Structures are given as C-alpha cells and as structure tokens.
Amino acid sequence: MAVQPATITEQLTEPGDTQAPADRRAEFAALLRGDSTRPFLTSAWQHFVGEEYDPVRFATATVNFNRAWDWDWVKINPRAVYYSEAWGSVYDENDYTGVVPRLVSAAVTGVADLAKIRPLDPRTNPALAEHIASARLIREQLPDLALIQTVFSPLSVLLQLAGLPSYPGAEVSGATEQFTRDDLLRTDPELTHAALAAIAQTFADYVALLVAPVDEGGAGLDGIFYAVTGTASGDFFDRQAFEEYSGPYDRKVLEAVGDGQVVFHTCRADSHPEWFTGYPIDALHWDQFLSRNPALDTDFGVTVVGGVNNELFAVGGDRTEVAAQLGATLAASPKRPFLLAPSCTIPTPADPDSLRRLRDAT
C-alpha cells in the first residue's frame, strides 16, 4: 500500500530571520551550470536517528534542521538502509550502531536468492513510497530551496541486500551470512547482472518520480545525491570490475534524472573521483582530506563539493581546525563556483559552534 502524504505544519519550527533570496532553487541550478554570481552555496546534513522510520517525523526533522541553519540547498538524508528494505531486508529500528540500524534478516542469503530481486513499483512499494511521501512533505515546507534526495548505486544496494559491506574494512551490524562479495557477484554472473538490472530499473523509476512535479504524482525535487558509497574506494573493486558491476547500472539511474541535477558522491580514501568525469552529473563530491584523494581545486570539468572534514563537526571536535580548513578551502577556491559542505555526513549530534562557522563562512 502506498504511503499517503500527511501534514507536518504543526510540528515545525518557524523559519528564522534570514536574508534568503527569493529563489534559491534557481541559484543552485545556476551554480551547477557554472554561471552563478556567488562563489559558493553552503549546506550540511546528518542522520536523524529516532525519527527515520516515520515519514512525517523524518520530514519534520529535516525541515527544522535546514530552517535552523538556513542552508542554501538541502540534501535529504534518509535512513541508510531503506534501499534494501524495499526488497525485504529487515532492520531493527530500535537498535542502531552509530547511524545505521542493526540488520535482522537479509533479503539475499545465498546466490540463489538473486533470482528474487525483481523490478519494483516505487509508487506502491512501502519503503520507496514512504520516501516519496516524506520528500513531498519537505518540498511543501521548503518551496524555495533546492532539494536533492539521497540514492545509493545499484551495486551498493545489492551488497546491502546480502548483508555485505559497501565500504572497505567495514562490518555490517547483525550480519550472519558466510558468503563473500566474490561469491555474490561471480558465482552466477547472469543472475548477478539480472539483479543489478532490476535494482537499476527500480531506482530509475523512483528517481523519475522524485523529480516529477507534485501535480503529476511526483515529489517535486530538484535532483538527487547519488552515492556509490565505498565501492570505488581503494582496491574494493578495480576499475574494470567497477565498470562491469556498477557503470551501466549507474548510468541507467542517472539518466532518469533528466533535466534535474545530480550531485555525485564517492566515499572514503582513494575514492577515484576521476572515474566519474564521463558520467551525466553536475557536481562531484569526495573527501579531500583522506589519503590518495585529490585537492578540492582539482578541475574535473564539473562543480566540486567539499570544504571541511565531516568528523570535525562531532561534539568535542576541534573548532579551531574547522576554522582553519574553511579558511584554506576558501583561500584555494576552485576555478568555478562550488558547493561548500562537509566531506560526508556530519555526526549525530553535531557541534553547533562548528556548524555556525560553516554557515557564516564568507
């Protein structure tokens, strides 16, 4: 059953006394085209643990956070596991390790289960319909801000479906499966690619709904924040394997954005942002502070995103270093307007003084 939009007006804080321009959506689009008169636009995002499993509460938390800090654009940051929940993976919403709920049961427990991964209708699938509904609610309350929804790559989702990590060296809380990434991907290549194609088709349809106007049944968003998670990091996959298992499926989803905007994220150290310069994307985000990653002023031919190490925003983090990194980023500004943001999701909770330094950067 599709999740129906609800009202969140009574739960929201009032907007602060800001000097926001009348149409930040147009300003965001102009910056991604490279013709903005402003040198950068600023944002940050975090997980709202405890609010993520209800579309109204999640939308309320998202709107309140963005109103409180008056961000120039909004990355909607839903629970990190809704992608695999769409195909039946189960997580304990009351038992988190950090910002990720504990896995109770994976949808894929063996290679044969790949045959069960079929295309889904995002309008009726509970997990996807829930996030379309929450996105509509956020759009209703933030009509003048560019909104982009987080979408994981099909390869990342397939690994998540099997209870396998999508980051080098990571562990999945609650995972019990004994098969490996190679078992999943290489035992039956035909099944593997059929599953990846089904995920890509599902998320292409989902993305098309996210960017469609509300009066046409969509969520009215400006685009997506597309994350390949850590699948391009280090030697997790070499370039040839990445292109086989991720490339065509990434492009399928990205092309569904149409005229919308795509901010593309590749996570962790040695994350190879140069692999993605030929993708249909508008902005490229990587962690400039981790080893073997390029500096933010590297010219990749698209708008770049970055500015401060996300871990510094933890409560008790080094506020002096936040200020120093901001200063260094602004002093060595990229050659074209850019998006000023942390290098990844900021901690929950985050230090308000450090966030204020980011917000007030000029």
Where are the language model's segments positioned?
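Intrinsic-disorder/low-complexity, polar/charged segments
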Residues: 23, 54-55, 107-113, 318
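A gly/proline- and charged-residue-enriched helix-loop-helix capping module
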Residues: 97-141
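Segments that shape or occlude catalytic/ligand-binding pockets
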Residues: 54-84
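Conserved strand-to-helix beginnings and helix N-cap segments that scaffold or border functional pockets
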Residues: 55-56, 83, 87-88, 319, ...
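Glycine-rich, positively charged N-terminal anion/phosphate-binding segment
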Residues: 27-31, 58-62, 81-111
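A residue-identity detector for tryptophan
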Residues: 45, 69-73, 87, 96, ...
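Glycine-rich, proline-tolerant flexible connector loops at the mouths of alpha/beta enzymes
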Residues: 75-97, 112-123, 221-240, 343-345
